[in-house]
Amino acid sequence: RLVCCQAARANPLYLAYQKARAEDRDLREEDFRPIEAGDTLASAIRIGHPVSLPKAIRALVATRGVVEQATEQELADAVARADRTGMFNCPHTGVTLACFEKLVQRGEIRKDERVVVISTAHGLKFTEFKARYHAGTLDGIDSPLANQPVEMGSEPDEVASAIHRVLDARI
């Protein structure tokens, strides 16, 4: 089953899917209305009128697919949660992870099902986004999962000392 994930500020397919769902029927091209996509942390998927719309709708219908959206807060927190596991993801993958979490919580994805999340960019391309999340300076975003940055010098002794200070403060 295919799942389409969109940022809430750039969600025309999600809106079309919700319209079809409210009428208890499959998604159709005539459900779609282009939108002017708003600013989103997931800038590469800021698309209000996808050129591949007919293919996307055919794929969703053929696979009994669903469409979900993620808010800016949800995508930012999903990225921070993933970072804590060693996955260093981009905001676009954060949209997918946030939507995945929502679908699991609603039971649309069962715990015994296998899921593949395709990440097309690396977090290193989005270091400013990550640093601002953890510093609590992203506009309109709370940072409940922030891992506060620690300033330190570049000498090994300074790095070791900074690590000890952080660890000692946690004990």
Where are these predicted regions, by residue range?
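Extended hydrophobic secondary-structure segments that form protein cores and membrane-embedded regions
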Residues: 1-7, 116-120
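Active-site/ligand-binding loops adjacent to catalytic centers
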Residues: 3-91, 133-171
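Claisen-condensing/thiolase-fold acyl-transfer catalytic domains that form or cleave C-C bonds
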Residues: 72-128
